[in-house]
Amino acid sequence: METLLLDGETLTLEQVRAVATGAARAALAPAARERVRRSRALVDARLEDGEAHYGINTGFGTLAEVRIPRADLERLQRNLVLSHAAGVGAPLPLPEARALVLLRANVLAKGVSGIREHTLDLLLAMLERGVVPVVPERGSVGASGDLAPLAHLALVLIGDGEAFLAPPGAAGRPERLPGGEALRRAGLEPVVLQPKEGLALVNGTQAMAAVGTLALLRAERLAALADLAGAMTLEGLLGSHRPFAPEIQAARGQPGQIAAAAHLRALLAGSELNASHQGPGCHKVQDPYSLRCMPQVHGAARDGIDFCRGVLAREVNAATDNPLVFPDTGEIVSGGNFHGQPVALALDVLAVAASHLAAISERRVEQLVNPSLSGLPPFLAPQHGLNSGFMIAQVTSAALVSENKVLCHPASVDSIPSSAGREDHVSMGMTAALKARQVVENVRTCLAIELLVAAQALDLRAPLRPAQRVAEAHARLRERVPHLSEDRALHRDIEAVSRLVDEGALEP
């Protein structure tokens, strides 16, 4: 198993996924360890200068003017973690919680947070030994960062809260335990937080970045899969390949459109079905937009997803706590890097971009099941009337598309003041992340439905064969889901194709 060396500078989104899914380990890079030592030394030095330093020997937020006696500084950090662990709702799924731990460790590895080596080592040991904090999804407004989610992470470090014990490679369901018990079972001991450490752990954008990163990576795969689903539908509807010609795309110059059209051309190369309806005998002049404009719509989605990738690629290596500790200049400086606006905006774009993959997919399903549009039996049903075929599969897709329209209302346009007016503009970044995650999940199901329905259409076009790559995907789908010869409970078929999507088994 690959071991990633965290340095706060070079972590990639794909590496985040690898650690989140248990496919890679993480350790602290030697150079990062030295930076951590130096930043901690500066914090310790400032403790001796008699001055007020925010979050080190003062209260927090609107209580920043309150000086805390030296004897109470450890208690101050513990109280910060306890008081901020006010999250509610379902716990983050294990991959997202692991990504959260990884991202917080990577940020601390930059050496500008003032954390001790010992505390950072415990965080990485938890990741290594499968101690995964129970982190409620809700309760963050995205500034000062994701306070509540990160506080729930920090609870486990101090032997409080709850954790799943899920050692990498272990079989069975993870065990949910009190945090201290989970540490003990993993052979670890809780830490007593020193001045600045509680603040270094709870202040940052890592929850929204963790959820958003995994949603983004899934959306990227779905953008490619949308081309396959669209190509399969196009073949089933005897659609034209001509709108995907490179000169059309070059005349507009949008990079996502150019990439999507190239992918569609590759998927559709060598199609017998296409050859069967070319030439002067073809009665079609133009296909519906949901077929003809796939490069433009899928391409715009790709461009939006790419924008989100750029933001998150920077954010996973960003120092987003406050104050920041700069040992090279000897300064500890308060700022606003905890504000999640860049991530919130990017995740709203991700949701809107991905939603269009489902919206146009559902319209293609309508083309397939509507006999006046497809020339195929109504709802692709055998003995239609007695059988309803894929009638309600299209309705399910429509329901998810409409749900996405609600979810795509941007979270980042909202703000609500908190902390007695001190935190008077917030990002709602975690809300954007959770919404984007659900939108992407809905897109996956809509594409699974389209693939299922398009496969039936291809069956009905036999003996003519589709393009080779479309035929290969059709064959893989048919290994799991048989042709619909009479009505059956379609939810099982939708679930089976959705699993194929998750496994990457249909990826072109």
From Swiss-Prot:
It is an enzyme of class 4 (lyase). The gene is hutH. This is Histidine ammonia-lyase. There is a cross-link at A143-G145 (5-imidazolinone (Ala-Gly)). InterPro entries: Aromatic_Lyase, Fumarase/histidase_N, HutH, L-Aspartase-like, Phe/His_NH3-lyase_AS. Contains an active site 4-methylidene-imidazol-5-one (MIO), which is formed autocatalytically by cyclization and dehydration of residues Ala-Ser-Gly. It comes from Anaeromyxobacter dehalogenans (strain 2CP-1 / ATCC BAA-258). It is found in: Cytoplasm. It holds the Pfam family Lyase_aromatic. The modification 2,3-didehydroalanine (Ser) is found at S144. Belongs to the PAL/histidase family. GO terms for molecular function: histidine ammonia-lyase activity.
